[in-house]
Swiss-Prot record:
<protein>
    <recommendedName>
        <fullName>Metallothionein-1F</fullName>
    </recommendedName>
</protein>
<comment type="similarity">
    <text>Belongs to the metallothionein superfamily. Type 1 family.</text>
</comment>
<feature type="binding site">
    <location>
        <position position="7"/>
    </location>
    <ligand>
        <name>a divalent metal cation 2</name>
    </ligand>
</feature>
<dbReference type="GO" id="GO:0010273">
    <property type="term" value="P:detoxification of copper ion"/>
</dbReference>
<dbReference type="Pfam" id="PF00131">
    <property type="entry name" value="Metallothio"/>
</dbReference>
<feature type="binding site">
    <location>
        <position position="29"/>
    </location>
    <ligand>
        <name>a divalent metal cation 3</name>
    </ligand>
</feature>
<dbReference type="InterPro" id="IPR000006">
    <property type="entry name" value="Metalthion_vert"/>
</dbReference>
<feature type="binding site">
    <location>
        <position position="50"/>
    </location>
    <ligand>
        <name>a divalent metal cation 5</name>
    </ligand>
</feature>
<dbReference type="InterPro" id="IPR023587">
    <property type="entry name" value="Metalthion_dom_sf_vert"/>
</dbReference>
<dbReference type="GO" id="GO:0071280">
    <property type="term" value="P:cellular response to copper ion"/>
</dbReference>
<feature type="binding site">
    <location>
        <position position="34"/>
    </location>
    <ligand>
        <name>a divalent metal cation 5</name>
    </ligand>
</feature>
<dbReference type="GO" id="GO:0005634">
    <property type="term" value="C:nucleus"/>
</dbReference>
<feature type="binding site">
    <location>
        <position position="44"/>
    </location>
    <ligand>
        <name>a divalent metal cation 4</name>
    </ligand>
</feature>
<dbReference type="InterPro" id="IPR018064">
    <property type="entry name" value="Metalthion_vert_metal_BS"/>
</dbReference>
<feature type="binding site">
    <location>
        <position position="24"/>
    </location>
    <ligand>
        <name>a divalent metal cation 3</name>
    </ligand>
</feature>
<feature type="binding site">
    <location>
        <position position="59"/>
    </location>
    <ligand>
        <name>a divalent metal cation 7</name>
    </ligand>
</feature>
<feature type="binding site">
    <location>
        <position position="13"/>
    </location>
    <ligand>
        <name>a divalent metal cation 2</name>
    </ligand>
</feature>
Length: 61
């Protein structure tokens, strides 16, 4: 269980617009945390909760 996430892996949780957890992969939201991509990246909002602005992020590879 992620110490910064309110649920165990596979559990149920509410994913907010801002992300404080390191590995939130709860079944209720099916999203993980990642850095926000630049505005031109269409993949940024797919499958992740933004936890901060960054020019480099895993969901925009």
């Amino acid at each position: 269980m992620d110490p910064n996430c309110s649920c165990p892996t596979g559990g149920s949780c509410t994913c907010a617009g801002s992300c404080t957890c390191k590995a939130c992969r709860c079944t209720s939201c099916k999203k993980s945390c990642c850095s926000c991509c630049p505005a031109g990246c269409a993949k940024c909002a797919q499958g992740c909760i933004c936890k901060g602005a960054s020019d480099k992020c895993s969901c925009c590879a």
